[in-house]
């Protein structure tokens, strides 16, 4: 679970901040 969370976190930040 933790590994998946770390993998999804950057994508979440990208979606929220629109900075990819």
Curated annotation (Swiss-Prot):
Keyword annotations from UniProtKB, A to Z: Amphibian defense peptide, Antibiotic, Antimicrobial, Disulfide bond, Fungicide, Secreted
Disulfide bridge positions per record: 14-20
InterPro entries: Antimicrobial_frog_1
Predominant subcellular localization, coarse grouping: secreted
Pfam family, one: Antimicrobial_1
GO CC list: extracellular region
Tissue specificity: Expressed by the skin glands.
GO biological process: one example: defense response to fungus
Subcellular location(s) of the protein: Secreted
Highest taxon of source: Eukaryota
Entry keyword Secreted: yes
Protein family (similarity comment): Belongs to the frog skin active peptide (FSAP) family. Brevinin subfamily.
Function of the molecule: Antibacterial activity against Gram-positive bacterium S.aureus (MIC=17 uM) and Gram-negative bacterium E.coli (MIC=4 uM). Has activity against C.albicans (MIC=14 uM).
This protein's name: Ranalexin-1Ca
Organism annotation: Lithobates clamitans (Green frog)
């Amino acid at each position: 679970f933790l590994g998946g969370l770390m993998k999804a976190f950057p994508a979440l930040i990208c979606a929220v901040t629109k900075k990819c």
